[in-house]
Amino acid sequence: MNFYINQTIQINYLRLESISNSSILQIGSAGSIKSLSNLYNTGSYVEPAPEVSGSGQPLQLQEPDTGSLVPLQPPGR
């Protein structure tokens, strides 16, 4: 037997301390929550990462790219 529930919810103020990658924010009713995990290649990598040095020597770091593919909000507020 399936039940279909239609709800109208009005939220005037919602304060969240933190939400991480594995958090679920549920508002309303749900019979079941199905997990979903997506892995995206946002850096357009075409080969695996280099092997980690076992000698304990620090690895040479490259300069970070100054351009961002993700539009970020400017600091402030």
Swiss-Prot record:
Region (Disordered): 48-77
Induction comment from the UniProt entry of this chain: Expression is sigma K-dependent and negatively regulated by GerE.
Annotated Polar residues bias: 54-65
Pfam families associated with the record: GerPB
Entry keyword set: Germination, Sporulation
GO biological process: sporulation resulting in formation of a cellular spore
Function: Required for the formation of functionally normal spores. Could be involved in the establishment of normal spore coat structure and/or permeability, which allows the access of germinants to their receptor.
Full protein name: Probable spore germination protein GerPB
Source lineage: Bacteria, Bacillati, Bacillota, Bacilli, Bacillales
Gene (UniProt): gerPB
